[in-house]
Amino acid sequence: MKFVDEVSIRVKAGDGGNGCMSFRREKFIENGGPNGGDGGDGGSIFMMADENLNTLVDYRYTRHFDAERGSNGGSTDCTGKKGEDLILRVPVGTTVIDSATQEVIGDLTKAGQKLMVVQGGWHGLGNTRFKSSTNRAPRQTTPGKPGEQRDLKLEMKVLADVGLLGLPNAGKSTFIRSVSAAKPKVADYPFTTLVPNLGVVSVDRWKSFVIADIPGLIEGASDGAGLGIRFLKHLARTRLLLHLVDMAPLDESSAPDAAEVIVNELIKFSPSLAERDRWLVLNKCDQILEEEHEARVKEIVDRLEWTGPVYVISAIAKEGTERLTRDIMRYLEDRADRLANDPAYKEELADLDQRIEDEARAQLQALDDKRALRRSGVKSVHDIGDDDWDEEDVDDEDGPEIIYVRD
């Protein structure tokens, strides 16, 4: 199934049903009173998180959704039927954003969680509602209110405990294959991984965590190069980042330079995400002589001025992977205990999570705007020169502003 993590849709709640104007008509009752019923409320639209979904592809081709309209009221004080609510199922981890205001309407992070995105219109009133001591035969009704309408942007972020960072061919997919049952594609060319992959790592019978592998980053990714920048948002909700570095690149490039590229791109994308706990994992140690390990490790650590945990592994030979996964499990358990017992730490992490979300959304929006300008043939706003303006266009200062964009 095709992986889609961003879509734009339009949702329209049902209109409320109109009130009815009716009068009682029975044998021997010549002037019966009003008996027009109210209309039914319009149906609302909800988003529901479904743990069985892992893509938004269903909304790629069907983009307009309308809830049912409420029925009109009837005679004999019959109230119209309420419009049926519409439930749109999305993957767990989906954020719902109002496209017009960029306001985050809600975040669906738990299976079964529901979120109302547009509310159905209120019902209209029948003429029975307007009966009074001075108006015994009212001919007044009200129409139903229109339902809300919104343009929404749905963003899905995979929910994982641990995220993998690295250049293409750093061995991320091989690592996730070696520690979990996931089987992402592995090959000896860059960008083998085109979409995020998830794997469940079982440390023992009762303990496990989820690890996410995203497409590799390259230099300039924060400016739109490669594939990784749009997938970096999937690491926003991870608890720990693993920075994988190839200790023995086939092209004989510098491992310290490669490690530095990832750090720089991460900071450019989101300085707050760079503050997330991160471990350095040096992969493919089986490709170099054992006596060279210490020198290679020191070279990379010194270049990054690294002070955090460092692991030397071989994912394909499964050397050092068991120790790494057990340490990750221990870290996640300690983190959960501290969150439960330390309110200040919990508040600190919540603030960090919010900053990461805001920075990631702003970065991706800026990238989308840049791509839109490229498609229109304009590299930037500054490319529109003075010769592109016509003095006649600015005679009416109160008129609409007209901007010309080169095709």
From Swiss-Prot:
Domain OBG-type G: residue ranges: 160-333
Domain Obg: 1-159
Bias kind Acidic residues: ranges: 385-400
Disordered: annotated span: 128-148, 376-407
Keywords linked to the UniProt accession: Cytoplasm, GTP-binding, Hydrolase, Magnesium, Metal-binding, Nucleotide-binding
Enzyme nomenclature, EC number: 3.6.5.-
Gene3D superfamilies on file: GTP1/OBG domain (2.70.210.12), P-loop containing nucleotide triphosphate hydrolases (3.40.50.300)
Family: Belongs to the TRAFAC class OBG-HflX-like GTPase superfamily. OBG GTPase family.
The protein's name in its UniProt record: GTPase Obg
Species, as recorded: Pseudomonas fluorescens (strain Pf0-1)
